[in-house]
């Protein structure tokens, strides 16, 4: 299976996403695989048997969101210089979303930009983080506030890597699949309601459909100037939750699941979404053991955290809210008291 992202503008940044077992990757320049110890221990041998390159280096970064920062980026860039990579060299991001974001950002700034390839190894990164060219690091003010749009040259999605994925991380990836269905495709949502993603064929279809939906949006709006903002459904709340908990309590997909439930509650209270549809979405998330509640200790403080998000512009909070399953609205007209009312409902879970 193959999905194509058409980004032919003044510079062709189009690329293919291959959703099949990796057969071979042939490269003609120095190449560095960037990974973490866990992925390397489980899958590096498998990947090395598929890659041909004149010079191949392995760079291992510490595992986890805590290390998605300037210090780790500097370490990675230093290793690229140590190995004498140049502007013709290629980086391979081999891991989950953190590795993909870090490697992509390093590729965007190393010698003013070099090519990179995404080989995502988690469900969440396969259906979301590896597609679309968003790269970056976190800082003390929030998530992904330092970064760049830098498209990969190709993405290889191989479900072989999911065989060793813990159940919790699998469920976190399902949250992003549900997100795509709720925002863009009612038929896909109904299909998800009826089918079990733990079955291999169902999982492959869900990955393909999610990637197709995201690819179509990225092709229309590469740099998030308009419709691509719809992909942030659930994320406005999720990023505050992650920031408040120091990125330790929830996986990203878990925070997004809670964020979707919060966004749905806001949509119900503003008359956009029916209570029945909100419950359908919540029930689907719970079927995969995803959290759907977060204890908001201080609604006013939570509200102020929205303004640290890069999606907030001119002191205005934009929300992506479903107005039906498969349809959405992007709005900046929600009043503070409406938001606070929703947050108060989450003071106790």
UniProtKB/Swiss-Prot annotation:
GO MF terms held by the record: 3-dehydroquinate synthase activity; metal ion binding; nucleotide binding
Cofactor(s) annotated in UniProt: Co(2+); Zn(2+); NAD(+)
Keyword Transcription tagged: no
SUPFAM superfamilies: Dehydroquinate synthase-like
Location in or out of the cell: Cytoplasm
Naturally occurring in which organism (per UniProt): Nitratiruptor sp. (strain SB155-2)
Function: Catalyzes the conversion of 3-deoxy-D-arabino-heptulosonate 7-phosphate (DAHP) to dehydroquinate (DHQ).
Predominant subcellular localization, coarse grouping: cytoplasm
Recorded name of the encoding gene: aroB
Alphabetical list of Gene3D superfamilies matching this protein: 3.40.50.1970, Dehydroquinate synthase-like - alpha domain
This protein's name: 3-dehydroquinate synthase
